[in-house]
UniProtKB/Swiss-Prot annotation:
Name the record gives this protein: Lactase/phlorizin hydrolase
Biological function: Broad specificity glycosidase of the intestinal brush border membrane that hydrolyzes lactose, the main sugar in mammalian milk, to produce D-glucose and D-galactose. The mature protein is composed of two domains that catalyze the hydrolysis of beta-glucopyranosides and beta-galactopyranosides, with a preference for hydrophilic aglycones (in lactose and cellobiose) for one domain and hydrophobic aglycones (in phlorizin and glycosylceramides) for the other.
Species of origin: Rattus norvegicus (Rat)
Signal peptide as annotated in the record: 1-21
Glycosylation sites: 370, 514, 824, 936, 948, 991, 1037, 1176, 1240, 1281, 1509, 1657, 1684, 1762, 1815
Membrane topology reported for the UniProt record: Single-pass type I membrane protein
Tissues where the protein occurs: Intestine.
Length: 1928
């Protein structure tokens, strides 16, 4: 049944047939049409006898592109057609061939002339051409992407065709296959939209033809499928409303010979069309016509008679089905009517086997039984049909892992693993961990160039219990991400609903033996169709159900391990079949119309052949085997709805045994009807073959073979594999395909070959799977034979498997993957095997052709319209004006300098990677390559290269082009910058010796890059001079200018038609200085005073010479650009305020980059500072002239302007300081007169990580040389022997590229591209292989040099896909208000602010003791006075009023109330302070939030053990009781403990906090924590039981936690580490209180395991009794939560002997270097983590009411009132809290930490958290509001962030009494690089951060106006307004 979307086309285009359709001349001869020409037809007609596959008229492969000269036999062929009464011939034009550019302005004239010649040949043979404008594939063009563009382009193309061929053509068709054209349109998923597009295009062509070309007297139509017409008979009234758009109706007609209706009757039915219309049968397909049936001639005669007799308005039809064309060496090709009717399918004709036996199996056996081995194994050199799909498969349980992730339920395979049933006790719990790696797996597919990916969906991953319920969101998200990634990479998803992994919950109800599972499966399938069907168009209901039935329920080898072959296996299969049929009908009825997909089933089968080829019994047994294996499922679906008749064997054996040995269920008649035809395709998987004999002595055992009555064997000559059941029998797949086609699909349905492969064993070579390479070659070639020679309609070939996985009972011992997976590494790295490259090659060739199939990829284009233009001929000033870069940025605060910027680069930005020949190619002496200076150098002893390494092999890229291309595709790079080895193509350096093999290598590389849509950027010289040229002096010899030009000229001529970006030299500074000054690089010359200048002089002139050669000889034709790559570090003045350092920094830049750039980009001469300095020093050295050579005026003019773009390589930055070096001996280094100082010291890295230097360097280049196009051609970080998790490199690229983005977006630098150094690990010069720069790890110890992706290789493609670093949707700013009644608060703590440490009877606390202990507190600070809040109640209340908060959270000093910690004595003076303070708060309308304990334990209690002494629980309860009694009438918000984690872990673990205990880190923290929890619970119960009723307050605890993100989200261990981090920090105390009264399981498990592992007899973590658990559980009224930052967590295994909290947690943490820093080393600004951890609290603890009781950020250094960093922090974090509210988190309040600067524990007063500055230089300690205080006050007044689009909000107006804050320190503050007065800075601050506007007189007014301009629809603004020099 054709898809119903054709209704739209019919109704919108063809209902109103034009009146011209009825004017067809009555005397016009009847049309009998043949054609068109196809590649197969031409091949068959041109083949000598014996080479033809069959007599083919219109083959099944690509239509023939017109190429001159036309085949010589065409004239004879056309004449024979005319002699056979053929009158017309179909010709298919190629749109893409005629208009290669897409525009009729530039047609391919050769193609036009070719088609005219073809049409004229037809006319000469008296055949009338019938021309189709668009047969299948429209040309790929970016223009088609635009809405409405297709119709315009098609009209343009049609006009050209009418003009060019109209004099030769009278009959035109716009489209002949609508469905295939739609599939090739950009928006094919929207079928209705695509059909409307074609309708518009057709109408345009029709109108143009009849308006402009009516004089030609022709007709125009479009081809439709005939079976749609009866269902779509139009209403006459509707027809009148539609204008005509065809002259006659053209149909694609299929007819079944065995149909009840005759063909004439079928034609007569078409006459019911209204209005009456002439009908032409464009294609006549005769199906299911047996060779012994009606003769073709009689059928043809009956057709003609019916037409004449019944006056059927049929003007003609296709006669291909009645023609037979032959050719031999002696006669010309000829065609005639045939007497043996061909069986024509939708795409091809299949020749029936003559005189074949009755059954399909016997006919197949007869066709191949007598083949000789030579004939059977002959290799077919041919290609698959166009559109053939190449794919790869996996199964969910094989690869996903993630067994306990995000709510996923267990499957039967999880249960199977728990039984330790698999080899090596392997389980599927982690498998290949694909659950965490969807992007990585898709990248692998992209690398192979797969077109389809067959994967399965985990049923229990979506529905944990199998039944319809709330789906698992994380599971849905995983598959959405996978599918979206596939489509982004142009890979078609083929989703399997069931691949053996039934939810265990359903298995416990009987599994597939329980009828209810069918309903459950239907619900699951319906959800998948609804959720994913908008993108998935190929569905598989069941994958290999035979395996599930046989091995799962028959032999019990597979899960669920049930052994019942006679009963269970048949019952399971029965229910699977019913589930499949109902699922297909579900899709057909409810989803097909909208989604336009296809649903099938994948069945597996071996091929069976008789053991005794002459035995009829064995032949019958073999046929029975096939029906038992394949027919068991295929026959009901594809034949008649019931099991095959061979199932009678079951009845037979039951009768023989006298009891039911097996029971085959029966289908009802309704079920049979449901089953029959319930598939859109047959999926087939096949691995091996079997020899079958009749069963020997039958027994009454219920084995599979015994029930089937056969016995299985293998030929011992068949090669073995690692699997005992797979033998290599390639020809079996061809025979099986032919059988399946004849028995089941019969040409009506396509076959998708959905599984084929073989495993290698663990003991085999990990990467060289040559045996599998052979397997694929043989098997795929047999599939090709089935398609080409047997004409089986196979649409795909899908390899098993993409990666190694869990193979059920065999565990991980058998490896099917094209990619090897290292299961011993937690990150499960994937490395390509040899077979991956082979499969790619087959895909690229679409089979086994000598040439790759041209895919016409969209070319990556770089914009070269704006090239560098030198307009200023003046030399640079000294120092240059580019020093503005220093002035512009030197005063930036660190926070502003490093703040991450969100944005994208220009659309055509070139993202690439770089390499160089000596470093990667190897093949140092291969195929005639000559030696280079690096070959000579590395083979010379004592060369200084680490480990005596050489580049002889390196990465072996010379021999592994496929491997390099694989990883380039995987990375999605748009460009590849590589270098040509001079000595590889000119072994002696001269063009008299050209090495063809070397040239061929680069041609293959360049061609492959272009074919893969990767832009080649080619460097001519990357330090590897041919040794033969060095022998004549190398670059000291001026003759190299001419020789280099000769080499370059050859490269331009040979490669320039494809290479459009050239660089002459890479980093000439390195080659010159390291090769001729220090001499550490070849040619190892040490003459530092003269030779660097002499050599550079020649290099510059050589560059200029080559530039002019390209410019004069090649540019006009090749249209490329040419430049050179320069390098330098950024030079930052050590003291930007010291002019000498500024000049020294500029001098360094001029002596490095300017040395070469100044002559080329400036004035043709060296920088004046170089000439001045070297000249003066030469004179001081008593030399007659400067050591720096001079250019003549002619040379200056020749050199000046010899670069089109600016390419530079950069890695790091250095501090530069002026220095006066020695004069002698003369040296280039000393000439610079400076000293370099490293910015920081890092170990294990090649370069210091100084990303901000990139932005400054780019700005310097812009200022120095003008704003010319710039390409960063190298940038990367080298690491010493890094792991695959190279997080440091990710941070490096992330921050460096972000600085480049700032330069582009904020500073206007014309940056066009970025190339990462380097693609893969390589030979790193003197460091050999010890320093690794590669995005890919290369194993240099393995002969094949396998490449494995590092984490950075996963990060970089995402950068490319996003074209930069756009703001993530979740990070977009959210405008809105918090809920009414939301609490805004500020916080402090007693010891941190009160002071008065011995006043009025206060007792000592542990912090008094700790701070008076030497070396405990930074700067020897203490809290004796602190902020003196004890004496400043009024001042503190005023500070709170400044903020406008409704609440204030403070703590009570235990020792101020109870000096010795007990109730023996209550200090009334201390209590009075709190009463007075609380009263003052209440009087000011501020509600107190009181923390009972904030770390300051009375020292008297610590003296008896503190929190390690269990008696403290009662002491704390008594202390709390005093507070409840005395203050409870005023205080309604109580917090028992603040951050117990810090108390326990830092006070009793690390000892960095009071009481400073660190010598029992494995026990003390847990004991203290245990008592803290019990103390909290007792205090809560006290309040709940005694005080709550009369006081009406609430009480809970404040728990602190960072958020933990996995360092590598794709690494399962890192994911688990992040969870452990949060559970050990926040869950330690939250889990007992808010969950179940006990510690988190991960804590209990890890601490117990480590305790026992250390020899202890129990866990170091104390246990709660059951009564304690009950008493602790639920002791909360709300969740008090403190949060400041986020970490990146990863697993770290400590030795068992280590006993500590950190060792137990087993987690290490780092920070992303792009995260803004604060004044605290541990606190990085990470707003996103705030929302995530709030959501975690919601999910983990059932969404309790949450109050954020602390959140803030610190600063260090000189105090400033303009705390822009804190405003950024508060704005970002509070906005994330607002988002959490929108996530339904029950957030009730927010508290800023802190109200004022205070004593910050061990750091003293160095870290300032306060929104009020406390001026400690003033004895009165005034509280001065910072800008952040006023910002926070605005948020409080507004209760959030008013939407500017809603107009000005009153809350944004400053209160009238708000006075500007005067600074106690300075009158001006720096703001974004400017010095502003406090008032101006404050205004600018509010403008920038609070309201995102530039310049403000009225804050609210401008907010309103900017909001109106920027708001688009309902979208939230996603980017701040940015200062040109700010990253804010």
């Amino acid at each position: 049944m054709e898809l119903p979307w054709t209704a739209l086309f019919l109704s919108t285009v063809l209902l109103g047939l034009s009146c011209q359709g009825s004017d067809w001349e009555s005397d016009r001869n009847f049309i009998s049409a043949a054609g068109p020409l196809t590649n197969d037809l031409v091949l068959n007609l041109n083949y000598p006898p014996g080479k033809q596959g069959s007599d083919v008229v219109s083959g099944n492969t690509d239509h023939l592109l017109c190429q001159q000269p036309l085949p010589s036999f065409l004239s004879q062929y056309f004449s024979s057609l005319r002699a056979s009464q053929v009158t017309h011939y179909k010709v298919l034009l190629s749109w893409a061939q005629l208009l290669p550019t897409g525009s009729s302005k530039n047609p391919d004239q050769e193609a036009v002339q070719c088609y005219r010649q073809l049409l004229q040949s037809l006319k000469d043979a008296q055949l009338e051409p019938m021309v189709v404008l668009c047969h299948q594939t429209p040309p790929t063009s970016s223009a088609i992407q635009r809405e409405g563009a297709f119709a315009d382009l098609f009209a343009d193309y049609a006009t050209l065709a009418f003009q060019s061929f109209g004099d030769l053509v009278e009959i035109w068709f716009t489209f002949s296959d609508l469905e295939k054209v739609i599939m090739d349109l950009p928006h094919k998923d929207l079928k209705a939209s695509a059909l409307q597009t074609l309708s518009n295009a057709h109408r345009r062509a029709f109108e143009i033809y009849h308006r402009k070309f009516s004089s030609q007297g022709g007709k125009l139509s479009v081809v439709l499928k005939a079976e749609d017409i009866p269902e779509l008979l139009p209403d006459p009234a509707l027809a009148a409303l539609v204008q005509g758009s065809v002259d006659f109706l053209s149909l694609d007609l299929s007819y079944e010979c065995q149909s009840v209706a005759t063909l004439p009757q079928k034609l007569s039915e078409l006459q019911n069309l209204e209005p009456k219309v002439k009908v032409f049968i464009y294609t006549l397909k005769l199906e299911d016509c047996p060779a012994t049936g009606t003769s073709p001639s009689s059928l043809l005669i009956s057709l003609l008679e019916a037409i004449n007799k019944d006056q059927i308005q049929t003007v003609g039809f296709d006669v291909n089905a009645f023609l037979s064309c032959t050719s031999n060496s002696e006669e010309s090709p000829s065609c005639s009517l045939t007497d043996s009717l061909a069986l024509q399918t939708e795409q091809q004709q299949e020749t029936a086997v003559p005189s074949s036996p009755g059954s399909a199996y016997q006919r197949v056996w007869a066709a191949f039984a007598n083949q000789s081995r030579e004939e059977r194994d002959a290799f077919l050199q041919d290609v698959f049909p166009e559109g053939f799909l190449w794919g790869i498969s996996t199964g969910a349980f094989n690869v996903e892992g993630g067994w306990a992730e995000g709510g996923r339920g267990p499957s039967i395979w999880d249960h199977y693993g728990n039984l330790n049933a698999a080899e090596g006790q392997a389980t599927a719990k982690v498998a290949s961990d694909s659950y965490h790696k969807p992007a990585s797996d898709v990248a692998l597919l992209r690398g192979i160039r797969a077109q389809v990916y067959k994967f399965s969906i985990s049923w229990s991953g979506l529905f944990p219990l199998g039944q319809k319920s709330t789906p698992n969101r994380q599971g849905v998200a995983y598959y959405n991400k996978l599918i979206d990634r596939l489509l982004d990479s142009h890979i078609e998803p083929m989703a399997t609903l069931f691949h053996w992994d039934l939810p265990q919950a359903l298995q416990e109800q009987g599994g597939w033996q329980n009828e209810s599972v069918v309903e459950a499966f239907l619900d699951y399938a319906a959800f998948c169709f609804s959720t994913f069907g908008d993108r998935v168009k190929l569905w598989v209901t069941f994958h290999e159900p035979w395996v599930m039935s046989y091995a799962g329920y028959g032999t019990g080898q597979h899960a669920p391990a049930i052994s019942d072959p006679g009963m269970a296996s048949f019952k399971v299969a029965h229910l699977i079949l019913k589930a499949h049929a109902r699922t297909w009908h579900l899709y057909d009825l409810h989803h097909r119309l909208q989604q336009q997909g296809r649903v099938g089933i994948v069945l597996n089968s071996d091929l069976a052949e008789p053991l005794d080829r002459k035995s009829p019994q064995d032949l019958a047994a073999a046929e029975r085997f096939l029906h038992f294996m394949l027919g068991w499922f295929a026959h009901p679906i594809f034949v008649d709805g019931d099991y095959p008749t061979t199932s009678a064997q079951i009845q037979h054996i039951n009768q023989q045994c006298g009891h039911p040995l097996a029971q085959l269920p029966e289908f009802t008649e309704a079920e049979k009807r449901l089953l029959k035809g319930s598939a859109d395709f047959l999926g087939l998987s096949h691995y091996t073959s079997r020899l079958i004999s009749k069963a020997g002595r039958q027994t009454c055992t219920s084995s599979y073979d015994n029930i089937g009555g056969f016995s299985q064997h293998v030929d011992p000559e068949w090669p073995q594999t690692a699997s005992p059941w797979i033998r290599v029998v390639p020809w079996g797949i061809r025979r099986l395909l032919r059988f399946a086609s004849m028995e089941y699909t019969k040409g009506k349905l396509p076959i998708f070959l959905a599984g084929n492969g073989m495993p290698v064993g663990e003991e085999a070579d990990l990467f060289d799977d040559s045996v599998r390479v052979n397997y694929f070659n043989w098997y795929i070639n047999e599939v090709l034979k089935a398609v080409k020679e047997d004409l089986v309609d196979v649409r795909s070939y899908i390899v098993r498997s993409l990666i190694d996985g869990y193979e059920g009972p065999l565990g991980f011992s058998q490896r099917f993957g094209l990619y090897h997976v290292n299961f011993n590494d937690s990150s499960r790295p994937r490395t390509p095997r040899k077979s991956a490259y082979l499969f790619t090659s087959i895909i690229e060739k679409n089979g086994f052709s000598a040439k790759k199939v041209k895919r016409n990829p969209l070319p990556v284009r770089a914009d070269f319209t704006s090239r560098a233009r030198v307009t200023d001929s003046l030399p640079s000033e000294v120092p240059s004006k580019a020093k503005i870069s220093v002035e512009k940025f030197s005063k930036q605060p660190r926070f502003e300098r490093d703040l991450f910027y969100d944005g994208r680069f220009r659309d055509d930005f070139l993202w690439g990677v770089s390499s160089s020949p000596y470093q990667i190619e190897g093949g140092w002496n291969a195929d005639g390559k000559g030696p280079s200076i690096w070959d000579n150098f590395t083979h010379t002893p004592g060369n200084g290269v680490k480990d005596n390494a050489t580049g002889d092999v390196a990465c072996d890229s010379y021999h592994q082009l496929d491997a390099d291309l694989n990883i380039l595709r995987t990375l999605k790079v748009k460009s590849y910058r590589f270098s040509i080895s001079w000595s590889r193509i000119f072994p002696t350096g001269r063009n008299s010796t050209i090495n063809k093999q070397g040239v061929d290598y680069y041609n293959r590389l360049i061609d492959s890059l272009v074919d893969n849509n990767i832009f080649p950027m080619v460097t001519l010289f990357h330090w590897d001079l041919p040794q033969a040229l060095q022998d004549i002096g190398g670059w000291e010899n001026p003759s190299l200018i001419e020789l280099f030009d000769s080499y370059a000229d050859y490269c331009f001529k040979t490669f320039g038609d494809r290479v459009k970006f050239w660089m002459t030299f890479n980093e000439p500074w390195c080659h010159v200085v390291l090769g001729y000054s220090s001499g550490i690089f070849p040619p190892s010359v040490q003459e530092p005073g003269w030779l660097p200048y002499k050599v550079s002089h020649i290099v510059i002139k050589a560059h200029a010479r080559v530039y002019h050669t390209y410019d004069e000889k090649y540019r006009s034709e090749q249209k490329g650009v040419i430049s050179l790559s320069l390098n330098t570090h950024w030079a930052e003045p050590k003291d930007p305020g010291l002019q000498r350092d500024v000049e020294a920094a500029d001098r360094m830049l001029q002596f490095t980059m300017g040395w070469f750039a100044h002559p080329i980009f400036k004035n043709g001469d060296y920088p004046d500072v170089m000439k001045w300095t070297v000249g003066n020093r030469s004179e001081l050295q008593h030399l007659a002239s400067s050591r720096l050579p001079t250019f003549t005026e002619e040379e200056k003019n020749y050199v000046r302007g010899t670069a089109d773009v600016f390419c530079h390589n950069t890695y790091t930055s250095v501090f530069v300081q002026h220095s006066t070096p020695r004069l002698n001996p003369p040296s280039y280094d000393d000439d610079m007169e400076l000293k370099l100082i490293e910015m920081n010291s890092s170990t294990g890295v090649m370069h210091q990580d100084v990303p901000w230097g990139t932005r400054r360097l780019l700005n310097w280049i812009k200022e120095e040389y003008g704003n010319i196009p710039i390409y960063i051609t190298e940038n990367g970080q080298g690491l010493e022997n890094p792991t695959l998790d190279d997080t440091e490199r990710i941070f490096y690229h992330k921050t460096y590229i972000n600085e480049a983005l700032k330069a582009y977006k904020l500073d206007g630098v014309d940056l066009r591209g970025y190339s990462a150094w380097t693609l893969m690990d390589d030979f790193e010069w003197l460091l050999g292989y010890t320093m690794r720069f590669g995005l890919y790890y290369v194993d240099f110890n393995h002969v094949s040099r396998p490449r494995t992706a590092r984490a950075s290789a996963r990060y970089y493609p995402d950068l490319i896909a996003n074209n930069g670093m756009p703001l993530a949707r979740e990070d977009e700013f959210l405008y809105g208000e918090f809920p009414k009644g939301f609490i805004w608060s500020a916080a402090s703590a007693s010891y941190q602010v009160e002071g008065a440490w011995r006043a009025d009877g206060k007792g000592l606390s542990i912090w008094d003791t700790f701070s008076h202990t030497p070396l405990r507190i930074g700067n020897d600070d203490n809290g004796d006075v602190a902020c003196d809040s004890y004496h400043k109640i009024a001042e503190d209340v005023v500070a709170l009023q400044n903020l406008g908060v409704s609440h204030y959270r403070f703590s009570i000093a235990w020792s101020r109330i109870l000096p010795d910690g007990t109730t023996k004595f209550i200090n009334e003076a201390g209590l009075s302070y709190y009463v007075r303070f609380i009263d003052a708060l209440l009087a000011a309308g501020i509600t107190p939030q009181v923390t009972i304990y904030h770390w300051d334990l009375p020292q008297a209690l610590q003296d008896v053990g503190g929190w390690e002494n269990e008696t403290i629980v009662q002491r704390f309860k008594e202390y709390a009781d005093v507070l409840f009694q005395r203050l409870g009438d005023r205080v309604k918000f109580w917090i028992t403990l603040n951050e117990p984690f810090v108390i326990a872990a830092q006070g009793y673990g690390t000892g960095v906090s009071a009481p400073g205990i660190s010598f029992r880190p494995g026990t003390a923290p847990y004991i203290a924590g245990h008592n803290l929890i019990k103390a909290h619970a007792e205090a809560w119960h006290l309040y709940n039981d005694v005080y709550r009723a009369r006081q009406g307050g609430t009480i809970s605890i404040t728990i602190s936690s960072d958020w933990g993100e996995p360092r590598d989200p794709t690494n399962r261990e890192h994911v688990e580490a992040a969870r452990s981090y949060v559970q050990f920090m926040g869950g330690w105390f939250a889990h007992p209180i808010f969950k179940n009264g006990d510690y988190p399981e991960v804590m209990k498990t890890r601490i117990r395991d480590r305790s026992l592992g250390a020899g202890l007899n129990k866990s170091r973590l104390p246990e709660f009794t059951e009564s304690e658990k009950s008493r602790i559980k639920g002791t909360f009224d709300f969740f008090g939560f403190n949060h400041n930052t986020t970490v990146l967590a990863y697993n770290l295994d400590y030795p068992a002997a280590f006993s500590s909290f950190d060792a137990d947690r087993g987690v290490a943490s780092i920070a992303d270097s792009s995260w803004p820093v604060s004044g605290s080393f541990w606190l990085k600004v990470t707003p996103f983590g705030f929302r995530r951890i709030l959501n975690w609290l919601k999910e983990e603890y059932n969404n309790p009411p949450i109050y954020v009781t602390e959140n803030g950020v610190s600063r260090r250094g000189e105090p400033e009132l303009n705390d822009t960093d804190r405003i950024y922090y508060l704005r970002s974090y509070i906005n994330e809290a607002l988002k959490a509210v929108h996530d339904k988190v029950d957030l009730r309040g927010y508290t800023v930490w802190s109200i004022m600067d205070n004593f910050e524990w061990a750091t003293g007063f160095a870290e300032r958290f306060g929104v009020h500055f406390v001026n400690r230089s003033d004895p009165s300690l005034p509280r001065i509001p910072r800008a952040s205080a006023k910002f926070y006050a605005t948020i409080v007044r507004c209760n959030g962030f008013p939407d500017p689009a809603q107009g000005p909000h009153p809350c944004l107006q400053q209160p009238e009494d708000a006075a500007p804050t005067a600074s106690p320190v300075q009158s001006e503050v720096p703001f974004l690089g400017l010095m502003l007065g406090i008032a101006e800075a404050q205004t600018a601050l509010y403008v920038l951060f609070a309201l995102l506007l530039l310049g403000a007189c009225s804050l609210a007014f401008l907010t309103y106006n900017t909001g109106r301009r920027s708001k688009q629809g309902n979208a939230q603004p996603s980017q701040h307004q940015l200062s040109p020099i700010s990253s804010f």
